[in-house]
């Protein structure tokens, strides 16, 4: 009887353990934004955490920054690095730093900071993200 109780408790605990393991990688909607006043509130060259966007570095591909939806901010706070994996657009795969926050209407989303000449190339799609240490 004791073995059955232990087995039952182990089976009941599986969802909790697997959720704990899989929360490291989640699927989110990704879009792209440019540092222009029509797409940002306040100064478009200053992110929510106070970081300054260098347009030259952005154009050269040296800045790999994202904005994250507010519901994910606790799990992925400003300054965190995330690995982005896209099956549809593998060219965007890589490690990005979180420096900005999306508007309140967005959930389970990231917004990749892109130079005006590049962001429109991909459109909205789903990606997998996980925190990088």
Could you tell me what each predicted segment is?
Residues 12-20:
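Short hydrophobic alpha-helical membrane-anchoring segments
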Residues 19-133:
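Solvent-exposed, well-ordered loop and adjacent helix/strand elements within mature globular domains
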């Amino acid at each position: 009887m004791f073995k059955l109780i232990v087995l039952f408790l182990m089976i009941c605990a599986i969802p909790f353990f697997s959720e704990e393991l899989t929360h490291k990688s989640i699927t989110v909607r990704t879009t792209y934004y440019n540092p222009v006043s029509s797409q940002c509130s306040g100064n478009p060259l200053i992110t929510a955490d106070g970081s300054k966007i260098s347009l030259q570095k952005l154009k050269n591909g040296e800045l790999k920054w994202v904005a994250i939806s507010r519901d994910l901010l606790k799990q992925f706070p400003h300054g965190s690095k995330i690995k982005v994996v896209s099956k549809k657009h593998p060219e965007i795969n890589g490690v990005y730093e979180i420096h900005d926050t999306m508007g309140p209407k967005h959930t389970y989303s990231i917004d990749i900071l892109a130079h005006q000449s590049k962001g429109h190339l991909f459109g909205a799609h789903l990606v997998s993200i996980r925190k990088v240490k």
